[in-house]
Design a protein with these regions (language model features):
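A conserved FAD-binding loop/helix module that cradles the flavin
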Residues: 153, 290-324
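Feature captures the FAD/FMN-dependent oxidoreductase FAD-binding
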Residues: 1, 6, 49-100, 201-214, ...
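Beta1/beta-strand and adjacent pyrophosphate-binding region of the FAD-binding site
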Residues: 1-6, 137-147
């Protein structure tokens, strides 16, 4: 499930082991987050296309526009279409929002939507291609968040001609989850960093367009469950910043579609699929899961490792099915 790095790594190993492999992708273009989430300046699309074409030549079958859980269910794949095993690697791509007033205004995006539009609609080739979204050109852009996705979004906005591009983060720079080099590159390119601030309301005009964001300054209290000190609002510190584009990079969670349409598939309290840490087997026989849909947001390297681990487990599972069939045939003959 899903043509992301986790499933591509799994597919590559399984096809080499001699199995027939089909990969289902919900979108119209293959590659998952490698294509629609990571900007062109960090990972050129031609590299991903090359790797996918290598898998095609080796016999992997790719199907696009297949939304598992809607177009087809897991049970239909196994019971009706005859697949012996299923590997779920759909990632954790459901964006989190701030749940503050004004998020409906034109010009307010989730980082997922913003980067997907930029990548799949080739806006990164601006000005050769028109921007297929509320224009960043000559506008003030604010990105809320401090992770790698926030850095991708703010640097993309600059490449789309933004007049200014700023990171607004509720803790200090030291607590930012983004890699140090990503922060360094953003600063080198002219991104402004505003820390210990938190948006509390988006403001707009009578036409429904974003015009500003109201923020409050923060102090740091006791550490929370992440080990970082919790931001605490400072009374009377409200201020308003003009902006016409705001991008929310506040993290992601698991899309519940597959979990809700697959009876017998165990999930965690946070909605991720529960899988054995060593084998990646789920509570449903023949169904395996790995990557962000199990662990939550992680790195590309960990995702690839999960795919290769799943391939080994699936291979062992399929060999056990073959042994059971041979044993049944032997008993029948006797």
């Amino acid at each position: 499930m899903a043509a992301v790095l986790t499933s591509l790594a799994c597919a590559g190993d399984l096809i080499q082991m001699g199995h027939q492999v089909h990969v289902c992708e919900a979108l119209h273009e293959l590659g998952g987050v490698l294509v629609y989430g990571i900007p062109e300046f960090r990972l050129p699309k031609e590299i991903v296309d090359h790797e996918i074409n290598v898998l095609r030549r080796r016999g992997v079958v790719f199907e696009t526009n297949v939304v598992v859980g809607k177009t087809v269910t897991i049970d239909e794949l196994t019971d009706e279409q005859g697949f012996d095993a299923v590997f779920i690697a759909t990632g954790a791509g459901l964006p989190r929002f701030l749940n503050i007033p004004g998020e409906h205004f034109n010009g307010v995006y989730s980082a997922n939507e913003f980067l997907t539009r930029v990548n799949l609609m080739r806006a990164y080739r601006f000005p050769e291609f028109d921007e297929p979204l509320y224009p960043c050109k000559d506008r003030d852009v604010i990105v809320v968040g401090g992770g790698n996705t926030a850095m991708d979004a703010v640097r993309s906005a600059l490449r789309l001609g933004a007049k200014s591009a700023s990171i607004y983060y509720r803790r200090t720079e030291k607590e930012m989850p983004a890699r140090v080099e990503e922060v360094h590159h953003a600063k080198d390119e002219g991104v402004h960093f505003e820390t210990l601030v938190n948006p509390v309301e988006f403001l707009g005009d009578e036409k429904g367009n974003l015009t500003a964001v109201k923020c409050v300054r923060q102090g740091l209290g006791e550490p929370d469950e992440s080990g970082r000190r919790s931001p605490v609002p400072i009374k009377g510190s409200d201020f308003v910043v003009p902006c016409q584009v705001a991008i929310i990079a506040a993290g992601t969670s698991a899309n519940p579609l597959i979990q809700s349409t697959t009876p017998g598939l165990a999930v965690t309290k946070r909605g991720y699929i529960s899988a054995n840490e060593d084998t990646l087997a789920t509570s449903k026989p023949g169904v395996f899961a790995g990557g962000d849909i199990v662990t939550g947001g992680a790195t590309v390297i960990l995702a690839m490792g999960a795919g290769r681990k799943a391939a080994k487990s699936i291979n062992e599972y399929l060999k056990s099915l073959d042994s059971a069939v041979k044993e049944a045939e032997r008993v029948a003959v006797n």
